[in-house]
């Protein structure tokens, strides 16, 4: 059966978008607010009608992730910011595989996400309350599956509880995207053997987005 590289590329961009948000937060203490909203909302929406629907139904919502994906696919150096992004992306994929083989953790994750939906009736998606709740899910359900993702950045920035919560919430969104990636036919071997196909697809999607002003 032929792979749907459009859906695979969208889901992979979702993982990369989370990785980029983590990097921005860890180094700067803030991140692309629109991209963060899209990624966090992907965790909450339990019944999307398509792969693109997970990310709000618009390719433009994944611009940051698509640009990051191209950087990861074409990274020649094992050092620097692209190496960081590659490490975060691969680590999220590893954790997702561990999650998918742990039925108890999957059930717990579903229950906790249902709880988030109830909180959304009273709090904004990017409120400290929701951020802390998402971070708590990551710490309680995902982190114990191991290995832990080592986030690197500014030590002063990473001491902030608000930044820590946003980083963990972004990692939770990355796990959501990694689950989706496998559901639509993604696999780590594609990063080695289908790099050109993924690069071409990501460039095609970016090409027909309206330029940012």
Swiss-Prot record:
Residues forming coiled coils: 79-122
Asked whether the keyword Cytoplasm is assigned, the reply is yes
Which compartment or compartments is the protein found in? Answer: Cytoplasm; Cell inner membrane
Membrane-topology annotation of the record:
Peripheral membrane protein
Sorted UniProt keywords? Cell inner membrane, Cell membrane, Coiled coil, Cytoplasm, Membrane
Report what the protein is called.
Answer: High frequency lysogenization protein HflD homolog
Q: Which InterPro entries match?
A: HflD, HflD-like_sf
What are the annotated GO cellular component locations? cytoplasm; plasma membrane
> Which family does the record claim for this protein?
Belongs to the HflD family.
Q: What PANTHER family does its record include?
A: HIGH FREQUENCY LYSOGENIZATION PROTEIN HFLD
Organism the protein comes from: Salmonella dublin (strain CT_02021853)
**Keyword DNA-binding: yes or no?**
no
